[in-house]
Design a protein with these regions (language model features):
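Alpha4 helix (beta4-alpha4-beta5 surface) of REC/receiver domains from two-component response regulators
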Residues: 92-152
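A short acidic (Asp/Glu
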Residues: 16-21, 46, 71-77, 107-113
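Conserved phosphotransfer microenvironments
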Residues: 43-91, 102
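A general structural motif
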Residues: 2-4, 56-58, 94
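C-terminal output/effector regions of signal-responsive regulators
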Residues: 142-208
Length: 208
């Protein structure tokens, strides 16, 4: 059985317990198609993620808060999952973003804490991780799946009533976004940098 909801997990170091949790749900329950992307700070940036067709075809993205480990990485690669969430809110607000973290102090930003893993993953630890993610992540995923389906239903209504909106560029753009037809003409580097600066400033102020 296949599913038309696609969930992609993005991390600079994919968490094996989370990977197993998401993959098992995908294989056993078929509520989403699972994919993953290993972020490489030596070559990746927010622009490369936006332009990656596999990621752009996702309905839900789970992304790590800190997408870089190398302190000498290109500055364009140094951005957080929170920043990516804001960027996607402009690039395509119909792609839903869940931000996860190993830190304890980001819940105020709607960030979900990862299960604390040890150096070696055991069967027992996987069971504990599954229970943890069932409590903190599962409901969020199910809610977003419901939202995606609702948006698609509205998009279908727009398509059926196309004659009523034939002169509306807004409706055309909405349909294109729902259909994952990208358009980044209005998403300039200047606008993106302004958004990133705002997020960074807010995080720094709250960490003081």
């Amino acid at each position: 059985m296949t599913c038309d909801i696609k969930l992609t997990y993005i991390d600079d170091k994919l968490d094996p317990l989370l990977v197993d949790y998401l993959y098992t749900i995908s294989e056993n329950e078929h509520i989403f198609e699972y994919d993953e992307y290993n972020f490489d700070s030596s070559k990746d940036s927010y622009q490369s993620l936006l332009e990656n067709t596999n990621i752009a075809s996702s309905d839900i993205i789970i992304v790590d808060s800190k997408l870089f480990e190398n302190e000498f990485a290109d500055s364009k690669s140094k951005f957080t999952g929170q920043e990516l969430k804001i960027i996607y809110a402009i690039a395509n607000p119909f792609i839903k973003i869940i931000v996860i973290t190993q830190n304890n102090d980001l819940s105020k930003y709607g960030v979900i804490k990862k299960f604390a893993t040890s150096r070696e993953c055991s069967g027992r630890e996987q069971e504990e991780a599954n229970k943890y993610y069932d409590n903190v992540l599962r409901k969020e995923i199910e809610t977003l799946i419901k939202n995606v389906k609702e948006v698609r239903n509205v998009g279908q209504l727009l398509s059926e009533n196309i004659l009523s909106y034939e002169d509306s560029l807004i409706v055309e753009k909405a349909n294109n976004l729902i259909s994952k037809i990208p358009s980044y003409k209005d998403l300039t580097d200047e606008k993106i940098n302004e958004l990133i600066d705002l997020v960074k400033k807010d995080i720094e102020e709250n960490n003081d």
